[in-house]
Amino acid sequence: YIIYMPSQNQLNVANEFGKTFVPDYSGEITINQKFGTLTAGKLSKVKKVHIEFSAGNIIESVSGGELDIRFSRTQVNRLEGKVKAFFEHNSGLKLVIDNALTELTIKNSFTQLLIDANKNISASFTIHTNFSELDNKSSFSFKEEGNDEDRRGPKFDHDYSGKSGAGNIPVKIKSEFGEVTIGHN
């Protein structure tokens, strides 16, 4: 189906077992995509994007709202505004962040998460991992809190903090059983 409508109207998209293509859209949008791929342009007023059991998803830009991605492979080329994200059992997830972001909160489980951060981003990072670790491939400096070299036995929980630029944008990540990589490209 091809649907033509004004791009500033509210839109709710629900699709199972099919491909969905949404071009740049300036109205409030909710997307629920299952068992098919999602390709989207710049989504200016996101209420919620939910993707489940899908591979090869590409979203050019998400501005605000909530991302909920499960059992999928997805790339988001730009996050803007205040975004809350929930990721579970994904086979690969890449998020690109820069100074268009105002706040990012991520809860991640069983997903290898790649954060591609612009070198000039002004962010303060707070990262907690459980049965996983932070792989810092960026030029930013991260410090592991409570890193006691004299401690005996395994350590399953890790707390990291880091800052780039003035640290204006809060980025909070909680990850269980999923490595978090922060890098540039």
Question: Residue locations for each model-derived region?
Answer:
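Intrinsically disordered, low-complexity terminal regions
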Residues: 1-185
